[in-house]
């Protein structure tokens, strides 16, 4: 016979007071600070030689204990159907290098379950990035919800594990990893479709690409030169007839050659100066 009951959300299963208590646990100033300092949520984590292996839980220990206690108290009195689960739809990591491309080294990044002593990658979701591949975006999708329990002396939850390999001679920071995720907590759990870990290589940012127009410094110099010329040649009750000079002549910068047949080859169009280091 098919199930005829109704599925209730966490808010419906618990009273308004307990729901507010859960909100305070998750979004209190202390909890937000712990998420930043202990989990590096949205912060840049530096991979150094003295920190070759980094294990960052997705929930701080204090917050984990309070959430587990909240669900357990509701479960013990029959208000909740379980002792609570942690759900993370996706973990996204932005990885950038902080050394030159010829440095020989790599990073191994994966999602693990702290309930596993071996800290093995969940469902084989693991990504290796060589130094010359960076920058890159990496994503992980757990296939199950993690019970809010304690295993031995470990608070069980998902964790991002980063391993640094190689980089001989580089003792400082060789890569920066910024991880983002959104943890959810519920009294019900589920299993999810297995999706391989995602790895997207990103083109390095070309910061000179947008420098196609004169900078503020160039415009200021041009305006100052024009003001000086005007004060020297201004005659009372006389018509001003000055030969306008192009910006490239005033700044003594050669203009790039115009493409043959393009509109920029027209004599009536003003020359555009080359941009060098922001000028």
Swiss-Prot record:
Pfam families: 3A (PF00803). Residues 246-279 are annotated as: Disordered. GO terms for cellular component: host cell plasmodesma. One of its GO terms (biological process) is transport of virus in host, cell to cell. Its main location: host cell. Residues 254-268 have a biased composition (Low complexity). It is found in: Host cell junction, Host plasmodesma. Keywords: Host cell junction, Transport, Viral movement protein. Belongs to the cucumovirus movement protein family. Transports viral genome to neighboring plant cells directly through plasmosdesmata, without any budding. The movement protein allows efficient cell to cell propagation, by bypassing the host cell wall barrier. Acts by forming a tubular structure at the host plasmodesmata, enlarging it enough to allow free passage of virion capsids. This is Movement protein. The lineage of its organism: Viruses, Riboviria, Orthornavirae, Kitrinoviricota, Alsuviricetes.
């Amino acid at each position: 016979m098919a199930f005829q009951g109704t599925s209730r959300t966490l808010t419906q299963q618990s009273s308004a007071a307990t729901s507010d208590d859960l909100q305070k646990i998750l979004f209190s100033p202390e909890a937000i600070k712990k998420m930043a300092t202990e989990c590096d949520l949205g912060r840049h984590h530096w991979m150094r030689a003295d920190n070759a292996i980094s294990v960052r839980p997705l929930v701080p220990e204090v917050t984990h204990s309070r959430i587990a206690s909240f669900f357990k108290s509701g479960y013990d009195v029959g208000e909740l159907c379980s002792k609570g689960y942690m759900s993370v739809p996706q973990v996204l990591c932005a990885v950038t290098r902080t050394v030159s491309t010829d440095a020989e080294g790599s990073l191994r990044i994966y999602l693990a379950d702290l309930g596993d002593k071996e800290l093995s990658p969940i469902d084989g979701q693991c990504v290796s990035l060589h130094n010359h591949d960076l920058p890159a975006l990496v994503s992980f999708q757990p296939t199950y919800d993690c019970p809010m329990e304690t295993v031995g002396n470990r608070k069980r939850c998902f964790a991002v594990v980063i391993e640094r390999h190689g980089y001989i001679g580089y003792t400082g920071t060789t890569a920066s990893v910024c991880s983002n995720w959104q943890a959810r907590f519920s009294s019900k759990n589920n299993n999810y479709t297995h999706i391989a870990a995602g790895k997207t290589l990103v083109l390095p940012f070309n910061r000179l690409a947008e420098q196609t127009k004169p900078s503020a410094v160039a415009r200021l110099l041009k305006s100052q030169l024009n003001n000086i010329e005007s004060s020297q040649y201004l005659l009372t009750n006389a018509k001003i007839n000055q030969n306008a000079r192009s910006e490239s002549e005033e700044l003594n910068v050669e203009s790039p050659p115009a493409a043959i047949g393009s509109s920029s080859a027209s004599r009536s169009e003003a020359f555009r100066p080359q941009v060098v280091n922001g000028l």
